[in-house]
């Protein structure tokens, strides 16, 4: 099993836990992500510097290098994005578009967790939070 497959399986297993978690628990997880990004800021910047060095050595276009680059401001933006998601109303469990069929059957749509989404990108570390 490849590393990507193992990460996908771990994400799928985690999604089962999150799918039944309440809003407070999900928001606590998002806050933990934001706090970890802040706490590990210097480590993230050091790793990004390694990525930038490799990108330059590989001849990556300057426009892609700019998208790859992180600084304190960009990390703060990512952290802010995570906290904005936590501040949104939780739509899970919401029932919409209720209707009654001629035979009396009541039908509605219930919002449920989407599941796991994989995102592959070459040069935008913030895209995961933006998505």
What are these regions, as identified by a protein language model?
Residues 91-131:
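Conserved small-residue-rich beta-alpha loop and adjacent elements
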Residues 1-107:
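N-terminal Rossmann-like NAD(P)+-binding subdomain of aldehyde/semialdehyde dehydrogenases
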